[in-house]
Amino acid sequence: MNSLFASTARGLEELLKTELENLGAVECQVVQGGVHFKGDTRLVYQSLMWSRLASRIMLPLGECKVYSDLDLYLGVQAINWTEMFNPGATFAVHFSGLNDTIRNSQYGAMKVKDAIVDAFTRKNLPRPNVDRDAPDIRVNVWLHKETASIALDLSGDGLHLRGYRDRAGIAPIKETLAAAIVMRSGWQPGTPLLDPMCGSGTLLIEAAMLATDRAPGLHRGRWGFSGWTQHDEAIWQEVKAEAQTRARKGLAEYSSHFYGSDSDARVIQRARTNARLAGIGELITFEVNDVAQLANPLPKGPYGTVLSNPPYGERLDSEPALIALHSLLGRIMKNQFGGWNLSLFSASPDLLSCLQLRADKQYKAKNGPLDCVQKNYHVAESTPDSKPVMAAEDYANRLRKNLKKFEKWARQEGIECYRLYDADLPEYNVAVDRYADWVVVQEYAPPKTIDAHKARQRLFDIIAATISVLGIAPNKLVLKTRERQKGKNQYQKLGEKGEFLEVTEYNAHLWVNLTDYLDTGLFLDHRIARRMLGQMSKGKDFLNLFSYTGSATVHAGLGGARSTTTVDMSRTYLEWAERNLRLNGLTGRAHRLIQADCLAWLREANEQFDLIFIDPPTFSNSKRMEDAFDVQRDHLALMKDLKRLLRAGGTIMFSNNKRGFRMDLDGLAKLGLKAQEITQKTLSQDFARNRQIHNCWLITAA
């Protein structure tokens, strides 16, 4: 009896043990990452030919303690390598693991290689050559703490390489894991199987091979035993012949069918090629199709299983599309696949919850470094009175109502950017802004008392409902999570896409960036204030302080201002302001842009302006500003400097976002100024719910 070890992906060990026992293995013992077992020579070959789950089958040769590199060398050399290699056989060493002595796996592999070569030269035998790419014999050494385990890898290449996939092709899941997913899916061979996001077809091909009794090793050309002296070619040929006979019989007798689709025509072509090379191409129908067009291929029965490994993302900006995809799949399953089973394998359990289905079973597994889950569902048969379920139905109804109200109003106003929803319902605490045919969903960070998983699920429901109600493409929804604005956080950089969208606001054309910053370059709540500035600016010298992207300057320029001066500390935003001005034909000496600390510039400037717009931060302690600034505390000092720059008969429009801001009217009077609050006049319909989003004042000489 041979003592053997079969390695596998984490989480599949028990499944592999059952598979090996069914092949005839005895004394199976599960350990992390594999199964120790025993079997005769025939079982060695059968495990190589028939195991769908094993990554490699190895023949342990011995162990040694490693306290120095000499210990490793002598421990390896103690094995009788000359009796193991056929004459002229090439070899390669795979070394994994480190300890205090062997700190580099390449060094460990070199020591093992030297020991094997020296074992031949000491007996005056020809030394075997190393062939890293296609060796006849693979030696596997695993170092754990002070113990090195040495084994012969009888597989050669990993057993996931079945021989039907082009090695150059990238597979999101290995064939061994795909086989496990099929086995755990609840699918019964003989019933239909459909994968609506099949990629290169791995799940369907593995299922078809299982269903038709086709050995996974049947199409492999190379093995790790070809240079091994104990290889029994006669038994191997018997095992191979039996596998070929069973495959022919299984294919001839199989009557059910497999269906695969994907939106990428190139991967569908690869899937067809892979299925043909695997010998089961005639059983699978592959189509280029998007999930949105998914339809039941057998509406009159029989029932089958939908099995897939849908995409999952690691970046926030990929989530809206994925949420929409999973929500859509859930709806299609309920509407068209009543009575069917569904099994999905994913690294994102939160995305699976977007299906709005209850799982009957779930399994955990590793896909490389990723922790994954497989969930199995049974889709209830639909009845005549079944109503489609909408995620976040209360939110969806409110959004639908708001859309009807604001869409017509915005068209009449001549604006493309407006707020559609502003935390109207407390449990759906988001803002939804439309920018032409794009939508930005801003989630206010939930309090720590709210369960993070529930908050995330609610956000997913919101995104799914938003896409459904507005009828937008998922890739035109941008998701942002933000805390209530706190000073400098307002301008936090999020990304580097550099994608700008041109939008219109009344008669102005403006650039917005929906992805790279917390804000987009256009404060929607200041829209009416900007229009008022345009109406007030004809023939006047206009100053814009804390200008951000200069949208107020654009309105003033289009309103006929004699000159505009735009001041901000950020070079990024000044360059953005320049692009906005250029987009509207506002160029030349009459339109100055100044990069400066606005407070310092204000103290030093001695020019005169007819119209000044200032929208300072509520609080700022930027390193580039000379002093910390608090708008409540410091607004009088600000007005004192502004008065010096204000030409006789001129006007200051002063705005800020501090909730509960109190204008010091007595202090203003002492400066010879008076203030008129115009906040209500500057709040448009889409911000009517949020009366405190900003406050706005007109200040003139008393």
From Swiss-Prot:
A GO CC term attached to the entry: cytoplasm
EC number in record: 2.1.1.173, 2.1.1.264
SMART domains reported for this sequence: THUMP
UniProt-annotated location(s): Cytoplasm
Record InterPro entries: 23SrRNA_methyltr_KL, DNA_methylase_N6_adenine_CS, RlmKL-like_Mtase, RlmKL-like_Mtase_CS, RlmL_1st, SAM-dep_methyl-trfase, SAM-dependent_MTases_sf, THUMP_dom
Provenance organism: Escherichia coli O6:H1 (strain CFT073 / ATCC 700928 / UPEC)
Function as written in the Swiss-Prot or TrEMBL entry: Specifically methylates the guanine in position 2445 (m2G2445) and the guanine in position 2069 (m7G2069) of 23S rRNA.
UniProt cross-references to HAMAP family, sorted A to Z: 23SrRNA_methyltr_KL (MF_01858)
GO molecular function: 23S rRNA (guanine(2445)-N(2))-methyltransferase activity; RNA binding; rRNA (guanine-N7-)-methyltransferase activity
Protein name per the record: Ribosomal RNA large subunit methyltransferase K/L
Membrane-spanning residues: none
Domain THUMP: 43-154
Catalysed transformations (reactions): guanosine(2445) in 23S rRNA + S-adenosyl-L-methionine = N(2)-methylguanosine(2445) in 23S rRNA + S-adenosyl-L-homocysteine + H(+); guanosine(2069) in 23S rRNA + S-adenosyl-L-methionine = N(2)-methylguanosine(2069) in 23S rRNA + S-adenosyl-L-homocysteine + H(+)
